[in-house]
A protein has these predicted regions:
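Interaction-mediating elements
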Residues: 1-259, 265-268, 289
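Strand-connecting loop/turn motifs
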Residues: 68, 152, 170, 301, ...
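Solvent-exposed coil/turn segments that connect beta secondary-structure elements
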Residues: 76-78, 91-97, 105-110, 178-184, ...
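Gram-negative/organellar outer-membrane beta-barrel architecture
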Residues: 115, 226-227, 246-505, 593-594, ...
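C-terminal outer-membrane beta-barrel translocator/porin domains of Gram-negative envelope proteins
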Residues: 215, 219, 223, 311-315, ...
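Membrane-embedded beta-strand positions of outer-membrane beta-barrel proteins
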Residues: 306-308, 338-342, 411-413, 504-508, ...
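In a subset of proteins, long, contiguous C-terminal domains/tails are tracked
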Residues: 503-505, 528, 532, 541-546, ...
Length: 728
């Protein structure tokens, strides 16, 4: 209807702003009015264009497809007090629901009938279920996949048709699914994989000049040597010579090769032929064989990327963030990805605070990461296993794990420098080993058995030292230390068929417990502190964080997104406080957008004094909760708008430190910072560029103003963020 609320076909918004814009500007001929009408207006829906009679006929046709053969749909036009407005009321009489009474499968070959009988528990159509057209088609698709997974390569959906009898029993359907008489002969025979030719190309039309043959496998390529080692491709290629053709093997092979990220184009074609084989009795038999030709076109070897974020706040704090990186595909002919990136950010004060003018850079951070990803799970047990050894294991019945996509093993080293001008310079050096894999589209896992980092102060000023002397909690969190960590992340996402999916990710990590267990076996107490690693104290903690996103597709051009994020960290044993880099914070382009990073918290503690320039050091916590709601309508083309509401804060677990900072279950919801705002997003296909304007609504501490809206200055509680990608 005109002024539909959130895309609803029934409810209308009480304020049809787009209709008002249309009425106000559509009759004007000037360019500005035409632009306003096109961008912000919405043409009213006319009864002449609705055609309720046709809609009623379409609805009856849909009822037939659902099994309501006697369903009736009538309509009535309801006039309103305004003669220009009217509503259409539809009356739907479902009638009797026709159900399946008997089901028979006819004319299938003997082996095909055996396959059907052995999988009847998986049948979509069963006695007593509604007679739905969609269910009938799903059953035909099930049989097609069943047959093609047992060698019937040429079998198609159209080779079976339905006969339905609705006369014998009122309200019941006797159904027959029969194979058609004009089926091609090869569709009733089982086919086996024969020779496999794999063609490596750097360009689609490249001529291949050399080849390498290994039994039934032939690799063709251009140049003096193969561009990639054979075993890398064979790990993803589920097709094997002399094996019965299975469509699922072909599907997994294509998906696996694509997920490697090395090829821009993959294609599998089959050439049928008849071969002679000798059975166990020495008799010659003829076998239908499919020779596979697989074309693999390499993607560009290098990827250069730039990621940028910018932020500005009306209190005067501004600064950009930049990431520049280079990725080399197939770095060492083993499908590896070598990634090198440099990142940096800085922030400065542009207006006068209580301490006077400050135009110099207040803080900056820069660093570099180097990572190498392998397209397999590499462990000490399989790191040096050869291709021939893998083939022998396969013949001996050791089936490889089946993954959704290509699993990866990533080795990473990093170095970061954090500088707070006039206070400190902190260095963080680290390395990690991570395994990523997926068992299906819905379930993904990431396990890091070793994440080792060393954090130390390269420089501290006397002013910073005096601050630390007066704040033991912050001093402990920023002390020099090793962090030997282990982490696991599980991500669930709804199946692709759902209109309104969810994504739920949970990360559990720990640090120092394995080392402390070793010390415990050596006779030291678990709770004893001061234990060292390489002559430096190490951290000991347990951390959990969960992230939940829900999408509602309101209509083809607008989406509503809800986001929840929560986390908690416990420090114990060798640590009285978690490291500064592991603490939680809120604010910024991907959090509460009305406030800067580390601009709020912990709890209802007030660090709003501009003279307190080290406040962002203190605005961290052991506990975090954040909630976001964002409406994303399309404005036109690839330009989308955003209307959002953000809330959240961080707290400390230890109430002894400060009453204002401590988490209390009965009061935490009262200490949530709240902000709103609007934004625009430009979808460029490969990535999204967005600008968000955040406006503060509520601060968790006492500002001297009563009521929910307690912002002391509207002008000073706004933030502008330029970022790449969606916030969640």
């Amino acid at each position: 209807p005109t002024g539909a609320f959130m895309g609803s076909s029934y409810y209308r918004t009480p304020f049809p702003v787009r209709l008002w814009v249309w009425n106000a500007f559509s009759q004007s001929d000037d360019a500005l009015s035409r632009w306003i009408t096109k961008v912000f207006g919405s043409k009213p829906k006319l009864m002449a264009n609705v055609n309720p009679q046709l809609r009623a006929q379409v609805a009856e046709h849909q009822l037939d497809k659902l099994g309501y053969f006697n369903g009736k749909v009538d309509y009535e036009v309801l006039t309103q007090s305004n003669p220009k407005e009217a509503k259409v009321a539809y009356k739907v009489d479902l009638g009797h629901l026709w159900r399946l009474d008997s089901i028979a499968y006819l004319n299938f070959p003997e082996h095909g009938r055996q396959l059907i009988d052995s999988t009847m528990s998986e049948a979509i159509i069963k006695k007593g279920r509604p007679f739905k057209v969609s269910s009938l088609e799903q059953e035909r698709q099930r049989l097609t996949r069943l047959f093609r997974n047992h060698g019937y390569y040429f079998y198609q959906n159209g080779y079976a048709s339905y006969l339905a009898d609705t006369v014998n029993t009122p309200g019941k359907v006797n159904l027959r699914l029969a194979m058609v008489d004009s089926i091609e002969p090869e569709a009733t025979r089982q086919w086996y994989i024969g020779n496999i030719n794999i063609n490596f190309k750097k360009q689609f039309m490249e001529e291949m000049t050399d080849s390498f043959v290994r039994r039934y496998l032939k690799f063709r390529y251009a140049g003096k040597k193969m561009p990639i080692r054979a075993g890398v491709v064979l790990r993803e290629l589920k097709l094997r010579p002399r094996k019965l053709y299975m469509v699922d093997d072909e599907t997994r092979a294509k998906a696996g090769l694509q997920s490697m990220g090395l090829f821009s184009y993959t294609n599998v074609q089959y050439v049928p032929r008849t071969t002679q084989v000798i059975d166990s009795l020495g008799n010659i038999q003829y076998r239908d064989t499919l020779d596979a030709n697989i074309d693999l076109v390499f993607d560009k070897p290098y990827d250069f990327y730039i990621e940028a974020n910018a932020k500005g706040k009306t209190t005067g704090r501004v600064g950009p963030e930049l990431v520049v990186g280079l990725t080399k595909r197939n770095a060492f002919r083993g499908g590896e990805k070598l990634d090198i990136n440099f990142h940096g950010s800085h922030e400065w004060q542009t207006i006068n605070g209580q301490s006077g003018s400050s135009s110099k850079i207040n803080s900056y951070e820069f660093g570099s990461d180097v990572s190498l990803s392998f397209p397999s799970i590499i462990t000490p047990w399989n790191a040096f296993r050869t291709m021939a050894q893998n083939e022998r294991r396969f013949r001996n019945g050791h089936m490889p794990h089946r993954y959704y996509g290509t699993p990866t093993t990533t080795v990473k080293a990093s170095m970061n420098i954090l500088n707070r001008a006039g206070y400190f310079r902190r260095h963080v050096a680290g390395g990690e080993l991570t395994y990523d894999w997926a068992t299906s589209y819905q379930h993904r896992h990431s396990f890091s058995p070793l994440i080792l980092s060393y954090e130390y102060m390269n420089y501290t000023s006397p002013k910073f030292d005096s601050i630390m002397n007066n704040n033991v909690y912050v001093a402990t969190s920023m002390a020099d230390r090793f962090i030997p960590k282990m982490s696991y992340t599980y991500t669930y996402r709804s199946a692709q068929k759902y209109r309104s999916p969810i994504v739920w990710s949970t990360t559990v990590s720990e640090a120092g417990n394995v080392l402390s267990l070793g010390y415990l076996l050596a006779g030291k107490k678990w709770s004893e502190d001061g234990k060292t690693m390489f002559k430096n104290e190490y951290s000991q903690f347990f951390k959990m964080e969960t992230d939940f996103v829900k999408y509602w597709t309101l209509n083809p051009t607008s989406t509503l997104v809800a986001h929840l994020n929560a986390g908690v960290i416990w420090s114990y044993g060798n640590s009285s406080q978690a490291p500064y880099t592991e603490m939680f914070y809120v604010g910024g382009a991907n959090s509460i957008r009305a406030f800067n990073v580390r601009g709020i918290g912990p709890g209802k503690q007030d660090y709003s004094d501009l003279s307190n320039k080290y406040a962002n050091i203190l605005r961290t916590g052991d506990i975090k909760f954040q909630a976001n709601l964002e409406y994303r309508p399309r404005i036109w083309g690839d330009l989308y708008g955003a209307l959002f509401l953000d809330a959240g804060n961080v707290w400390m677990k230890d109430a002894d430190l400060s009453e204002n900072e401590a988490f209390k279950f009965g009061e935490f919801y009262k200490q949530m910072a709240v902000g709103t705002g609007v934004g625009i997003r430009y979808d460029m296909g490969m990535f999204v560029v967005r600008v968000d304007w955040g406006i503060g609504l509520h601060l968790p501490y006492d500002t001297g103003k009563s009521g929910f809206y307690n912002i002391p200055s509207f002008k000073k509680n706004q933030s502008l963020h330029l970022a790449v990608g969606y916030p969640f």
